[in-house]
């Protein structure tokens, strides 16, 4: 399944605000589609599916990528759900977004793909690159790279930055000091793990 490239307004009307995907919001409370205004109690499967879709669209993943992350998380000691969130939050494109160096994860992914980002002074062009505590994020010493990120930093996608990250706006650098606290992620990871467990 490919990455979604359709109308994001339909997605946020169906799933709610997804800051990683877009800054756009909608004032319409009904879901898209012919029967969007009809109230019906969702099944347990529908609830788990919706939470999975929230996570997938927010982080900009294909179904295949998300399934691989779930399998990796299951091999990590401890809570599978928390391990899944930590894997996703430590993706380079997400770290760039959380630092305010890009307004959305797709914008952060573009920065990485185009070679604007360095990790520990080495240029990294893989958005899914797994960062770790202690990593330093910087911007390539090129006028275009610096200009893009300076502009983005004036209008960050999120109002607050998680405690495990720090940003130096003057030098356009960021640092990862640890692992994100669970409370910063507005998703129910247990429902997502249950969804894949029941699918076998």
Curated annotation (Swiss-Prot):
Keywords: Chloroplast, Plastid, Ribonucleoprotein, Ribosomal protein, RNA-binding, rRNA-binding. The keyword RNA-binding applies. It is found in: Plastid, Chloroplast. GO terms for cellular component: chloroplast; small ribosomal subunit. Pfam families: Ribosomal_S4, S4. It comes from the Eukaryota. Part of the 30S ribosomal subunit. Contacts protein S5. The interaction surface between S4 and S5 is involved in control of translational fidelity. One of the primary rRNA binding proteins, it binds directly to 16S rRNA where it nucleates assembly of the body of the 30S subunit. This is Small ribosomal subunit protein uS4c. It comes from Guillardia theta.
